A protein has these predicted regions:
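Catalytic histidine-centered segment of alpha/beta-hydrolase-like enzymes
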Residues: 288-299
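Short beta-strand/loop motif that positions the catalytic acidic residue
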Residues: 250, 256-258, 262
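Conserved alpha/beta-hydrolase "acid-adjacent" motif
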Residues: 263-269
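The serine-hydrolase catalytic nucleophile loop
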Residues: 101-113
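N-terminal cap/lid segment of alpha/beta-hydrolase-fold proteins
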Residues: 35, 40-87
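Alpha/beta-hydrolase active-site loop
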Residues: 141-163
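Hydrolase active-site cap/lid region
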Residues: 184-232
Length: 311
């Protein structure tokens, strides 16, 4: 097996964690300013978060509260945060944001302010078993791409049924492993998802792991990467997954954003995805890696806003 491929594979998980831990926390802290939290505890349904912002004229302006929202998928309880723009009396679009490997909802909050200003409700959540920091379930030994897809499908269907949501304007935004899950979900619910945004999407996960474990007998009961244990089921489920054949079932607009210095996810995979999709574009951020610095995120956010504004 090619040594560089092994390094890339291991780097995917290791660097994802490192980038999230070092970069995304800074990113969130830069985007979510002067945060005030009123925590009512897990016994209640809501933890209110008030954001104090400045409007265009520098005046203090209080944004709508963020609240916790649990969504049930069978016996899986999904913890998330919903942020709503000021109520206009009309149904509102929603952006559902999926984190990457060993991430959490906190890494997705950076999207909220700008999308709320566009009139979008935003929902960021913790995949059960998707992270050691997950408030849904932190048993990563049970991590599963297919379970995460099922969770995201359930979230989409939940919001589609809500009276304050524009069911014809549901957007998925996924980063890294969350990008793979979002792409699979859009393909499985092509009528329910309106637009798809993939940020340095890890569409390579099945191929990379199959290269790492060529035979089923090679897969151990537990694979531990950066102290994150992953069970055998994770690898068994993706062995026959044909990502690029599957994701092209989604025929609606797709935006992919990636840095040209991404050492974890190959730009070739993103280019291949653009060719597979019916309507897709790739925005490349110069010198950006697998995870964006604040100014790179600002560029990404600008492209995403433009994409969502298009008819």
């Amino acid at each position: 097996m090619n040594k560089n491929k092994i390094i890339t594979l291991l780097g995917f998980f290791a660097m994802s964690m490192m980038v999230m831990a070092q970069g995304s926390e800074k990113l969130v802290s830069n985007q979510i300013l002067n945060q005030k939290v009123v925590d009512e505890g897990d016994s209640g349904m809501f933890n209110a978060v008030a954001l104090e912002e400045k409007d265009d004229k520098g005046r203090d302006e209080k944004a709508n509260n963020f609240k916790t929202l649990w969504i049930k998928n069978g016996d899986r309880n999904i913890f998330g945060i919903i942020g709503k723009p000021h109520y206009t009396g009309k149904k509102q679009p929603i952006a559902i944001i999926a984190h990457g490997f060993n991430g959490s909802h906190t890494y997705s909050l950076a999207y909220f302010n700008e999308l709320n200003k566009m009139g979008y409700q935003c929902y960021a959540f913790d995949f059960p078993c998707g992270s050691l920091n997950s408030r849904s379930d932190n048993n990563t030994h049970n991590m599963s791409i297919l379970d995460e897809q099922s969770d995201l499908e359930t979230i989409v269907k939940y919001f589609k049924s809500q009276p304050d949501i524009d069911a014809d304007n549901i957007v998925l935004i996924g980063e890294s492993q969350g990008g793979l899950v979002s792409a699979l979900t859009a393909a499985s619910l092509p009528k329910d998802v309106t637009k798809l945004v993939l940020v340095f999407p890890a569409l390579c996960i099945p191929d990379n792991w199959n290269q790492r474990y060529p035979k089923v007998s090679d897969i151990p009961d537990t694979t531990t990467l950066w102290d994150v244990p992953i069970g055998r089921r994770f690898f068994l489920e993706i062995r026959d997954m044909d990502v690029f054949k599957t994701i092209k079932r989604f025929k609606k607009p797709v935006l992919i954003v990636q840095g040209d210095a991404d050492a974890v996810v190959s730009m070739d995979d993103s280019r291949r995805a653009v060719k597979n999709y019916k309507t897709a574009s790739l925005h490349v951020i110069p010198s950006a890696g697998h995870g964006f610095k604040p100014h790179e995120f600002e560029e990404s956010m600008g492209v995403i806003k433009e994409f969502l504004s298009e008819e």
